[in-house]
From Swiss-Prot:
Residues 351-354, 387-389, 509-512, 541-547 are annotated as: Interaction with host Mxra8 receptor. Residues 73-85 have a biased composition (Low complexity). Residues 84-114 are annotated as: Binding to the viral RNA. The record marks 187, 220 as: Involved in dimerization of the capsid protein. The chain crosses the membrane at residues 693-713, 764-784, 796-816, 1225-1245. This is Structural polyprotein. The record marks 261-262, 325-326, 748-749, 809-810 as: Cleavage. The active site is at residues 139, 161, 213. It comes from Chikungunya virus (strain Nagpur).
Length: 1248
């Protein structure tokens, strides 16, 4: 059956379908039951049906099939028959499945909203019109096949791999709508159904392919739910990499192993001014195995081409023999290389030599302690270039030789564990040590080794120093060298090796020198006669010459060699080089670390006593969660008891790899605020010792002063009374005056004489006179208590109660503390309506600064190319735009060193040394980013209890962004404090953030942070200042000595200290991606609420309460809802009422209760007051509650207070009662004394 092209059909242009033969009509009848008598009848009916119902045109296909079979047997094409029977050949192509309903619907919608992206005439992907944007995957190269869209200015987002631009006005009608609603189920795209489940889009494997990048995924309403970027093959199904939307926020879903689905564009390479696809090299040369030298020259010519590795792969795998062994293609590149000899400073017993196992580089960037060692031998490859895991090959003089891998060893202070080998590289886990040795045993059972000084101290993962991974523990972020032999982004340079001197090739024969080549190409030069130099591949005799006058070297230009600073460069080939990928890339992974035993914790008064049991050295750190964190840390190696003071703001303790422990103190004490004076003083002394001592001292001084004043006034009055009678002989003191002044009437006597007289003569009068002042004091105290002007309980409750959270309009504004996890209630009073209670709780608060990246810094790698060594030739350095590049020419080096200098010079040589710095291979994972931090934006998650429903919303706290909770509009912010824990300059390293005044870009200092700088981990622009200085080589062996400052990045890693996650004030939690501070308990959060009229309940519709009374049977202050109050009421009708405390210092747990008839309700409240007096409003009626609260029994709790904490505790009613009594008694004494003094003075003045 032939189909109309899809675009034509769905482009709304109708064309009649071509005629095709009608299908054969077959009547399918039910299978007859097996009956003995009806068997023949059933066969007859079946035969008749076949004869009458079968169509004639069906015979034609049988002939075609017959001809087809004959044609396959003959295998001789006939021109006439082939021309006529060409359509039957294409019949399998016509059997394509007809597009289903999903495909047809998608094609119809796609016809208007997607456009092809073309590059050099080929479709590489698609662009889609969605909403008011045209979207194209950023990895799709090319331009949109539309004149209007091609000229748009696109904005690129590398994070989402997307490019966007505004749709032209005249094309907005063609755009598709988008939606963030994605219920699990099936969706549609160009190739059929897409399943969405578990947050992932999947399709049957094979339904998508490269070239589909940019295609949209639609729901059943034709709305775009995602745009395809690529896919990851997972067996029977393929997981799609897509860009989608979640509540108007763009998100990218990338499954592991996803590949981009843009159509690959062939990369071109160059050969003799002729371009060709890099994946298809020409046949001259086309294969390394046929023409190795020419193939390597071709690769060197294209070493900087983007398709170099395609060309390398194609050149090395073009042989059929190698294709059959493609499972070992990762080792295939090593057939174009060879091992080599290089200088080793210690080959055993302190002697240096040219070793076959020379150490080139030791890398220790992995935080799990694994070492990556580069040596001069090659592991896993035999001398015939075949792969064998059990073998290694090394350079034996100038010929490679095989050895067993089992003889390979690595050791520091003790033998290491080799975890991976390939080519020049070894992975090993080693104990601590100061040297590193690599060795092997060759086929002759001779041991070779090389030792380098190297300080190895495995880093600490996490906060515990452990030696082996536990079976159970905590997964911690770390980095390691992945044990993968596949090609990676890391690479090394290789070049053509220099000629290798070999004196054994020459022998003296009767005054002549014979050169034996042994099937090699040998370069020779003799200083006897003329024309005694050149290349030879056959044995050659130099007449009339001596061996000492000749020099012979093996020339091999069929293999590359690692570009080592320990081996000279081939002078003839200059800077020609190649590149190969290396195994074992550094990657971020997780390492399982132990979790320290939980400490035994004992709580004291404002302190925590922790008994620690470390199994190995474990880090203990703690900080205050207030404005001054006072961060402290220490490594605990043995059992230890620590005492930590818990401040009012809370204490955060981190022990090992456990989650942090958080503690808050409670106002616990041994005394009570409702007892005797000494108990009250003890209560306040334990809570506030300094203030209590000051207050008691001042009060005692005042009282004693008052008593002293009273005594002084009495003495003055008595003296005024006695003086006139003492001066008059025989005077008699009046009775009333003698009674007031305590003197005898007839004869003035001292008080002591009067007291002695009464004690001896009239003891009842003595006691009566002593009781009179006490009785007067008691009477005066009772009078003072009955005075209406006396002060009631003086508490901070009266101050805090002013201005309860009420408002008389539907526009309500309130301010809540910026404390996460503490509910906050506000009451909305509107005239004519029943009060409404709103409960709000901050679930999280985020401060996200605006960052601008200055640069990234990481460990640098010093690149030392093989030096140029020439014989008495002039060499000149050339300027190169390389980071920290240094070049020097040294003359007169390596005197009389033929073999060492690889040079035909018997006097002196000239060496050109070069060096520069570049980013280490570890920079892709191990780097620190230097940011400038600007104004921070605040946002938060808010839980709102509104109309009986708990709703969680996210809002920006900027005073402008509005969120809707049902039918109410909430506007949060701006925050009362613009505080942020981040300085103007911050450094981000993995998941840690540090405040640091780093040097600006281009001004780094050697050995410090920023000594090497780059804009991004992938960028090529690198600035470096490492104090790299080349030094003169010493005699003995070819080398490039230099001096350089140590890596500033590695030094910073050791000295960086604690991150903001541990040192930030106000208990901030710091996170990255993006950089943000969460749940900082600082400042207040204003909230504006716009409540519609329909949300209120009229007073006539709400129940009214009467006869309300409140009783508090139990109350524990400073505890989480430790108070209980019983409110009795009489309700007019059944209904719901809002419950709210009219005092800030008291928080009620319940927000709404149901009332009915004469009943009572119990509410729980929390307060910090010892003597709480507050009013509770239920519906529109208020009731007064008074509670005498006792201190909590728990000293420390692991949750913050749910009530307003007062800076100074209130004074209880009992304490005020004692103050009134004591003050009243002393005041009465002073008043009586003053009255007596006044009367005496008046009488005294009247006489004069």
């Amino acid at each position: 059956m032939e189909f109309i092209p899809t675009q034509t059909f769905y482009n709304r242009r109708y064309q009649p379908r071509p005629w095709t033969p009608r299908p054969t009509i077959q009547v399918i009848r039910p299978r007859p039951r097996p009956q003995r008598k009806a068997g023949q009848l059933a066969q007859l009916i079946s035969a008749v049906n076949k004869l009458t119902m079968r169509a004639v045109p069906q015979q034609k296909p049988r002939k075609n099939r017959k001809n087809k079979k004959q044609k396959q047997k003959q295998q001789a094409p006939r021109n006439n028959m082939n021309q006529k029977k060409q359509p039957p050949k294409k019949k399998p192509a016509q059997k394509k499945k007809k597009p289903g309903r999903r495909e047809r619907m998608c094609m119809k919608i796609e016809n208007d909203c997607i456009f092809e992206v073309k590059h050099e005439g080929k479709v590489t992907g698609y662009a889609c019109l969605v909403g008011d944007k045209v979207m194209k995957p950023a990895h799709v190269k090319g331009t949109i096949d539309n004149a209007d869209l091609a000229k748009l200015a696109f904005k690129r987002s590398s994070k989402y791999d997307l490019e966007c631009a505004q749709i032209p006005v005249h094309m907005k009608s063609d755009a598709s709508k988008f939606t963030h609603e994605k219920p699990e189920g099936y969706y549609n795209w160009h190739h059929g159904a897409v399943q969405y489940s578990g947050g992932r889009f999947t399709i049957p494997t094979g339904a998508g392919k490269p070239g589909d990048s940019g295609r949209p995924i639609f729901d059943n309403k034709g709305r775009v739910v995602a745009i395809v970027l690529g896919g990851a093959n997972e067996g029977a199904r393929t997981a799609l990499s897509v860009v989608t939307w979640n509540k108007d926020i763009v998100t990218k879903i990338t499954p592991e192993g996803a590949e981009e689905w843009s159509l690959a564009i062939p990369v071109m390479c160059l050969l003799a001014n002729t371009t060709f696809p890099c994946s298809q090299p020409p046949c001259a040369p086309c294969c390394y195995e046929k023409e190795p030298e020419k193939t390597l020259r071709m690769l060197e010519d294209n070493v900087m081409s983007p398709g170099y590795y395609q060309l390398l792969q194609a050149s090395l795998t073009c042989s059929p023999r190698r294709q059959r062994r493609s499972i070992k293609d990762n080792f295939n590149v090593y057939k174009a290389t060879r091992p080599y000899l290089a200088h080793c400073p210690d080959c055993g017993e302190g002697h240096s030599c040219h070793s076959p196992v020379a150490l080139e580089r030791i890398r220790n960037e992995a935080t799990d302690g694994t070492l990556k060692i580069q040596v001069s031998l090659q592991i896993g490859i035999k001398t015939d270039d075949s792969h064998d895991w059990t073998k290694l090959r090394y350079m034996d003089n100038h010929m490679p030789a095989d050895a067993e891998r089992a003889g390979l060893l690595v050791r520091t202070s003790a033998p290491c564990t080799i975890t991976g080998t390939m080519g020049h590289f070894i992975l090993a886990r080693c104990p601590k040590g100061e040297t590193l040795t690599v060795g092997f045993t060759d086929g002759r059972k001779i041991s070779h080794s090389c030792t380098h000084p190297f300080h190895h101290d495995p880093p600490v993962i996490g906060r515990e120093k452990f030696h082996s991974r536990p079976q159970h523990g905590k997964e911690l972020p770390c980095s390691t060298y992945v044990q993968s032999n596949a090609a990676t982004a890391e690479e090394v340079e290789v070049h053509m090796p220099p000629d290798t001197p070999d004196r054994t090739l020459m022998s003296q024969q009767s005054g002549n020198v014979k050169i034996t080549v042994n099937s090699q190409t040998v370069r020779y030069k003799c200083n006897c006669g003329d024309s005694n130099e050149g290349l030879t591949t056959t044995d050659k005799v130099i007449n009339n010459c001596k061996v000492d006058q000749c020099h012979a070297a093996v020339t091999n230009h069929k293999k590359w060699q690692y570009n080592s600073p320990l081996v000279p460069r081939n002078v003839e080939l200059g800077d020609r080089k190649g590149k190969i990928h290396i195994p074992f890339p550094l990657a971020n992974v997780t390492c399982r670390g132990p979790k320290a035993r939980n400490p035994t914790v004992t709580y004291g008064k404002n302190q925590v006593i922790m008994l620690l049991y470390p199994d190995h050295p474990t880090l203990l750190s703690y900080r205050n969660m207030g404005e001054e964190p006072n961060y402290q840390e220490e490594w605990v190696t043995h059992k230890k008891e620590v005492r930590l003071t818990v401040p009012t703001e809370g204490l955060e303790v981190t022990w090992g790899n456990n989650e942090p422990y958080k503690y808050w103190p409670q106002l616990s004490t041994n005394g009570t605020a409702h007892g005797h004076p000494h108990e009250i003083i003890l209560y306040y002394y334990e809570l506030y010792p300094t203030m209590t001592v000051v207050v008691v001292s001042v009060a005692s001084f005042v009282l004693l002063s008052m008593v002293g004043v009273a005594v002084g006034m009495c003495m003055c009055a008595r003296r005024r009374c006695i003086t006139p009678y003492e001066l008059t002989p025989g005077a008699t003191v009046p009775f009333l005056l003698s009674l007031i002044c305590c003197i005898r009437t007839a004869k003035a006597a001292t008080y002591q004489e009067a007291a002695v007289y009464l004690w001896n003569e009239q003891q009842p009068l003595f006691w009566l006179q002593a009781i009179i002042p006490l009785a007067a004091l008691i009477v005066l105290c009772n009078c003072l208590r009955l005075l209406p002007c006396c002060c009631k309980t003086l508490t901070f409750l009266a101050v805090m109660s002013v201005g309860a959270h009420t408002v008389s309009a539907y526009e309500h504004v309130t301010v809540i503390p910026n404390t996460v996890g503490v509910p906050y209630k506000t009451l909305v009073n509107r005239p004519g309506y029943s009060p409404m209670v709103l409960e709000m709780e901050l679930l999280s608060v985020t401060l996200e600064p605006t960052l601008s990246l200055d640069y990234i810094t990481c460990e640098y790698k010093t690149v030392i190319p093989s030096p140029y060594v020439k014989c008495l030739r002039y060499s000149e350095c050339k300027d190169k735009s390389l980071p920290d590049y240094s070049c020097k020419v040294f003359t007169g080096v390596y005197p009389f060193m033929w073999g060492g200098a690889y040079c035909f010079c018997d006097t002196e040589n000239t060496q050109l040394s070069e060096a520069h710095v570049e980013k280490s291979e570890s920079c892709k994972t191990e780097f620190a980013s230097a940011y400038r931090a600007h104004t921070a934006s605040a946002s938060g998650k808010l839980r709102v209890l509104y109309q009986g429903n708990n709703v969680t919303v996210s809002a920006y706290a900027n005073g402008d962004h509005a969120v809707t909770v049902k039918d109410a509009k909430f506007i949060v912010g701006p925050m009362s404090s613009a505080w942020t824990p981040f300085d103007n300059k911050i450094v981000v390293y993995k998941g840690d953030v540090y405040n640091m005044d780093y040097p600006p870009f281009g001004a780094g200092r050697p050995g410090q942070f920023g000594d090497i700088q780059s804009r991004t981990p992938e960028s090529e622009d690198v600035y470096a200042n490492t104090q790299l200085v080349l030094q003169r080589p010493s005699a003995g062996t070819v080398h490039v000595p230099y001096s350089q400052a140590p890596s500033g990045f590695k030094y910073w890693l050791k000295e960086r200290g604690a991150s903001l996650q541990h040192t930030a004030p106000f208990g901030c939690q710091i996170a990255t991606n993006p950089v943000r501070a969460m749940n900082c308990a600082v400042g207040n959060m204003p909230i504006s609420i716009d409540i519609p009229d329909a949300a209120f309940t009229r007073v006539v519709d709400a129940p009214s309460l009467t006869d309300m009374s409140c009783e508090v049977p139990a109350c524990t202050h400073s505890s989480d809802f430790g108070g209980a109050a019983i409110i009795k009421y009489a309700a007019s009708k059944k209904g719901k009422c809002a419950v709210h405390s009219m005092t800030n210092a008291v928080t009620i747990r319940e927000a709404e209760i149901e009332v009915e008839g004469n009943s009572q309700l119990q509410i729980s409240f929390s307060t910090a007051l010892a003597s709480a007096e507050f009013r509770v409003q239920v519906c529109s009626t208020q009731v007064h509650c008074a509670a005498e609260c006792h201190p909590p029994k728990d000293h420390i709790v692991n949750y913050p207070a749910s009530h307003t904490t007062l800076g100074v505790q209130d004074i209880s009613a009992t304490a005020m009662s004692w103050v009134q009594k004591i003050t009243g008694g002393v005041g009465l004494v002073v008043a009586v004394a003053a009255l007596i003094l006044i009367v005496v003075l008046c009488v005294s003045f009247s006489r004069h």
